[in-house]
């Protein structure tokens, strides 16, 4: 047998094994021929696929690179890009897809997967354009249609997404991606029963999909079907037991329905993976927020003893220590984390916070925060901490420019739509509608409200008359606020103003029984606002009871700073303020409820 015949036979046999799903057998065929076939690009391509099938990503990357060095073929570059995408290295993958398309602009696998990499990177507008371009040349391409639907979904275009998903289901009624997509969009729009039906159909078709069961659980929770929601979440965790986000969603739901198994899933998973930092830090934070600081500390110390990532654990230990008032211990942990990972932004953020909490280095904290803000200029949390550092260092002029309450905090009153005889009638209509959405029993521990309830999912994405008229009434006032913002290219708020806006998140809160909001900022906003729908009479004559307050930091400190500015809530009024402002409320003394709608705004 000639050398060429041996090469061809080796490649054919290996390709057959790979096609049959037997990468180990393909590897056994290829490895003995490495020296003989080392000059052949296709040999390295198949070897790479065999290594990838065996889960050896490093060996697969090396073999793909060897193939490309001999002959840079578009399909090999695409396969290398796919490898990086599977490793969640979307930026690197994108570069290789671009190289493949530079060699063959019509290479469809590279086009499709490049668009999916854009989805991975949250570049939804770019992904939408990429999928639209593919569909112009390939109008019946199912994968591209699904990709366009998913991009539209992420851009808030739920109706368009529904039409695209339905077009796939028309030709393939059991397509699980489309069934899942229909369920997500319908849930987002508030059509909960229909969402449950689609997601149940999807779960029947893909009983091993944790994503489908997670989305089904969320829809069942919205439908107030508690037992079924818990069962669906449990099923999802059984399929993906170490998914940190899934544990978070599940326990977030268990917490607000006062379920006795709250936090149990974390402990079960940590018994199997005691060094899992993501699970340990998430559990510790929930324990701390539930008033169980010593347990939180023990969880983190156990993960550290098990060999978990030291910088992350020391960072969270600092947080747990300082919120219990152990300021010196917090600073020791924060500095330890900074020595281990000096360039990590979360580590530096915690060090700055620990320095201020301990009272040991206000100037150093400000230097750290100023450095971070040069890299992350729209981070609302950094601006909140920076404001605190400016106040501690008596940097009055700069603080006044950043925190000018009289200029930056606005109060407006909505106008009732024409269909309502009065503002009071409008308010009562909204109260009645939103009451139906408050289906839980307790406040989420991760959020600011204490003693109350919060609606599930994004409120303003729902398609309901009450939500539509509320948004329109609020937008009329919010655009007026934007029109009156002064121009200032150097200010973190004014410099981003475009005159346009979109809601990035929204919810309704009901406080009761001495309820209040802890001091906090809004990390996902640019402007934030509270709209008041029900206000107890007591706030009019008690000492700031129920009032919204500004300026008091939301972390425990050795030398506390007090609030600086208060506003009296009024039914029908909205308070608008920069998202980076620390704000909370004074506790209520009466059992009567206070109802509000909160929302974050981003410039468009």
Where in the sequence are the language-model features?
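Short coil turns that delineate tetratricopeptide repeat
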Residues: 38, 71-72, 105, 139, ...
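Non-heme Fe(II)/2-oxoglutarate
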Residues: 399-496, 516
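Catalytic core of non-heme Fe(II) oxygenases with the double-stranded beta-helix
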Residues: 461, 465-475, 479-576, 581, ...
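Start-of-helix register in tetratricopeptide repeats
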Residues: 8, 42, 75-76, 109, ...
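Register position in tetratricopeptide repeats
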Residues: 19, 53, 86, 120, ...
């Amino acid at each position: 047998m000639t050398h060429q015949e041996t090469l061809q036979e080796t490649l054919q046999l290996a390709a057959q094994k790979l096609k049959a799903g037997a990468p180990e057998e393909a590897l056994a065929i290829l490895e003995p021929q490495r020296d003989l076939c080392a000059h052949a690009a296709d040999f390295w391509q198949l070897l790479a696929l065999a290594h990838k099938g065996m889960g050896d990503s490093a060996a697969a990357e090396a073999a793909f690179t060897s193939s490309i060095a001999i002959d840079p073929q578009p399909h090999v570059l695409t396969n290398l890009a796919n490898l990086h995408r599977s490793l969640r290295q979307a930026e690197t993958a994108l570069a290789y897809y671009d190289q493949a398309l530079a060699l063959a602009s019509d290479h469809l696998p590279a086009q499709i997967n490049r668009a999916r990499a854009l989805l991975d990177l949250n570049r939804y507008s770019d992904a939408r354009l990429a999928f639209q371009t593919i569909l112009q040349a390939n109008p019946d391409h199912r994968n591209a249609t699904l990709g366009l639907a998913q991009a539209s979904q992420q851009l808030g275009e739920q109706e368009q997404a529904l039409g695209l998903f339905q077009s796939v289901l028309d030709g393939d009624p059991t397509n699980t991606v489309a069934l899942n997509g229909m369920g997500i969009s319908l849930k987002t729009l508030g059509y909960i029963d229909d969402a449950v039906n689609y997601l149940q159909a999807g779960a029947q078709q893909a009983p091993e999909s944790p994503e489908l069961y997670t989305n089904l659980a969320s829809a069942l929770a919205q439908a107030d079907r508690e037992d079924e929601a818990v069962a669906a979440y449990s099923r999802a965790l059984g399929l993906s037991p170490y998914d940190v986000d899934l544990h978070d969603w599940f326990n977030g739901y268990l917490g607000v329905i006062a379920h006795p198994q709250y936090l149990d899933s974390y402990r079960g998973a940590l018994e199997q993976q005691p060094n899992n930092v993501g699970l340990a830090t998430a559990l510790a934070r929930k324990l701390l927020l539930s008033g169980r600081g010593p347990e939180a500390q023990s969880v983190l110390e156990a993960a550290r003893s098990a060999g978990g990532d030291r910088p992350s654990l020391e960072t969270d230990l600092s947080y747990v220590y300082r919120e219990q008032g152990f300021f010196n211990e917090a600073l020791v942990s924060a500095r330890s984390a900074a020595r281990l990972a000096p360039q990590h932004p979360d580590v530096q953020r915690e060090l700055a916070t620990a320095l201020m909490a301990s009272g040991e280095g206000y100037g150093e904290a400000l230097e750290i925060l100023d450095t971070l803000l040069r890299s992350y200029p729209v981070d609302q949390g950094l601006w909140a901490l920076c404001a605190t550092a400016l106040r501690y260092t008596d940097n009055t002029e700069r603080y006044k420019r950043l925190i000018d309450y009289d200029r930056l905090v606005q109060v407006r009153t909505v106008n009732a739509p024409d269909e309502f005889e009065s503002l009071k009638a409008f308010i009562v209509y909204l109260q009645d509608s939103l009451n139906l959405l408050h289906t839980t029993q307790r406040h989420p521990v991760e959020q600011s409200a204490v003693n109350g309830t919060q609606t599930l999912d994004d409120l303003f994405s729902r398609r309901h008359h009450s939500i539509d008229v509320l948004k329109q009434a609020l937008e009329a006032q919010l655009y007026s606020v934007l029109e009156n913002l002064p121009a200032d290219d150097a200010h973190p708020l004014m410099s981003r103003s475009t005159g346009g806006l979109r809601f990035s998140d929204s919810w309704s809160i009901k406080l009761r029984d001495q309820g209040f909001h802890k001091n906090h900022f809004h990390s996902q906003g640019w402007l934030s606002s509270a709209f008041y729908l029900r206000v107890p009479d007591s706030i009019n004559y008690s000492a700031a009871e129920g009032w919204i307050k500004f300026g008091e930091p939301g972390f425990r400190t050795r030398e506390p700073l007090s609030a600086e500015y208060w506003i009296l809530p009024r039914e029908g009024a909205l308070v608008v303020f920069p998202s980076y402002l620390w704000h909370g409320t004074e506790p209520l003394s009466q059992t009567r409820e206070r109802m509000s709608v909160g929302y974050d705004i981003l410039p468009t």
